[in-house]
Amino acid sequence: MKKTSLKLTTLLGLFLLPFTAFAEEPIQSLNKMSQAMRDLNYELAFVQTTPTNMDSFRYRHIKQGQKVYAQLVTLDGEQQEIIQRGNLVSYFQPGSRAFTINSGEIVDALPAVIRTDFSKLSQNYDFIKLGKDRIAGRFVDTIRIVPKDDFRYQYLVFLDEENGLLLRGDMLDREGKLLDQFRVVTLYIDDRLRGLTDYLNKVSVPPLLNESKQESSLAVNWKTDWLPQGFDLVSQNQDVMDGEVVENALFSDGLFTFTLYVNKADSTAATENTWKQGAYTIYSEVMGDKEITFIGQLPIAAAKRIVQGVTFLK
């Protein structure tokens, strides 16, 4: 009897093993993507598409020891360039004064999914492997990132089968409608890209932007009573616009972000306003003498619930 029980336990373990391994595979592929985007030397030409616009870029990434160099350049219209040298990111744009900020990465035009902590994200999303495809002449693994609630969007990622790099990322609404797409057209991987660092080091570093605001210690007189599970406060700040103080707070779950703005309501302001374009929702509502505005990558229903959950402290 004991032998039979032991045999059944062994067979059950063998039966369950492939399913466990398969369940772990998507997150392993996603973690491989994050590491590849951080550590490899590569050049991407890609397009960023929304329902109303399309822009093309070239992104180069080089890692020398522990220092990262990167360059993002627009390929249409007037050239705009962003250069990363270690923890300094410099912006160059025609007609505007160049400046530098303290940052360990270029975030403009690149999807947030490449910077995500997938272990944390797994608490609020499911990762589903869909199979193979082909992007930019290369075979890719396709993974769907699906929220466990109805308060955020979903993501479809296409990862290079050989090196793990992200070659396409689709942000989709709950019905599968495309909101935003990152799509690589050409990919070049070569350690000889390290020669680009000579050029990047020769470019003068523009003045460092004043970052004297103490965001972490700023106290505001309002709070959010409801947020979708997994969203945390990233930063909060105060700005002065047209002589009026505007308080803002940035929130993120690691994949999607939104900002709440609170300011004194104008006497002519509409009680409620809603605007939607692509992945972005703008929703504002007047409460007493305050106007609360949501701007971010969440559905309108979620934006409305967040705004209506803001309460003011006495």
Placement of each model-derived feature along the sequence:
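N-terminal leader/targeting segments and the immediate start of mature chains
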Residues: 2-5, 16-67, 104, 122, ...
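Sec-dependent N-terminal signal peptides
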Residues: 7-13
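Short amphipathic beta-strand/extended segments with alternating polar/hydrophobic composition
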Residues: 56-62, 82-86, 100-105, 181-184, ...
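Gly/Pro-enriched, hydrophobic low-complexity segments
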Residues: 136-204
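N-terminal mature ectodomain segment of secretory-pathway/periplasmic proteins
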Residues: 24-95, 126-133, 139, 146-154, ...
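Short, solvent-exposed recognition patches
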Residues: 204-287, 301
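Acidic/charged, solvent-exposed loop-and-adjacent secondary-structure segments enriched in E/D, K/R, S/T
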Residues: 91-113
